[in-house]
């Protein structure tokens, strides 16, 4: 089943018939594969590891699939398709990336849902593109078309990162935040509560949903001897975390994981401010799976230390899988759950 933006792209497939096409920030469907019904060759870059895993089995000679914040080479394309991102600031980065990989006078297509801010693209397109025009609209989505008219500047990550100092209960740390990664330029309430009641940890510790690396940096500030692994589903977050670690002279293994699936072996501790906040059934199910999978990933005596919005239904899952619910701290918005594996 194709998403609405993907359906809008397919019904305009004559725009890139017989061409070499790059797709940026594609969604959780098989659109890159279906583009081959019209395009000569397709390369797709996903910033979401779950979306990348959905497409991965379909890779072939004319369908190259990548995960990350950049492509591994400097290949240029006839057409670049951008799915307009939820984070508006990320759109500017994707436009720069598209410009770098377009042939001279190459074609740019930008698609997105009306409610997702797609109309902002008209003002966001940089000078090296022609003014975009609305090509089509359907299923509450819009498709804009533009053309590369000047050479785009090369991507320099330092232009897309914000560095700032953050005070934590463990001391001051430097945070490096790439566009599209959650940041308040201060310690958010949930993470502050989590770090204010941080148990002493040991051995191998997993930071799940690491984001820009705030929790890991604070943890290593207090206990530099820990062997921390940082996982996230978002490519920009993973790169941000790597930059944060380098800025603080810390070392940790940072890699993508869809849930805990890509982690290996058992951990002495799992720590997280899980990225499940909206209370929708889909994210609630993911949260429940996180609790269940955590039990399977912890050694005997392992510590599970997370913070969550108090309205989210964690307690039942924790009771089911950990056999008890231990709330070590709470306020009017958040609860810190701190459990141990006893058997």
UniProtKB/Swiss-Prot annotation:
Q: What InterPro entries does this protein's entry cite?
A: Mtase_sm_N, rRNA_ssu_MeTfrase_C, RsmC/RlmG, SAM-dependent_MTases_sf, Small_mtfrase_dom
The reaction(s) this protein catalyses: guanosine(1207) in 16S rRNA + S-adenosyl-L-methionine = N(2)-methylguanosine(1207) in 16S rRNA + S-adenosyl-L-homocysteine + H(+)
Q: Name one Pfam family in it.
A: MTS_N
Note the CDD domains from the entry. AdoMet_MTases
Where's it mainly located? cytoplasm
Top-level class of the enzyme under EC nomenclature: transferase
Q: Which EC numbers characterise this protein's activity in its record?
A: 2.1.1.172
Q: Where in the cell is it found?
A: Cytoplasm
Gene3D superfamilies per the UniProt record, alphabetical: Vaccinia Virus protein VP39
- GO annotation, cellular component aspect: cytoplasm
The answer on whether this UniProt entry bears the keyword Methyltransferase reads: yes
Residue ranges annotated as transmembrane are: none
> Per UniProt, which keywords does this protein have?
Cytoplasm, Methyltransferase, rRNA processing, S-adenosyl-L-methionine, Transferase
**Record GO terms (molecular function):** 16S rRNA (guanine(1207)-N(2))-methyltransferase activity
Query: Per the similarity annotation, which family is this?
Result: Belongs to the methyltransferase superfamily. RsmC family.
What's its job? Specifically methylates the guanine in position 1207 of 16S rRNA in the 30S particle.
How is the quaternary structure described?
Answer: Monomer.
The protein in question is named Ribosomal RNA small subunit methyltransferase C
Task: Give the originating organism.
Answer: Shewanella sediminis (strain HAW-EB3)
Q: What is the lineage of its organism?
A: Bacteria, Pseudomonadati, Pseudomonadota, Gammaproteobacteria, Alteromonadales
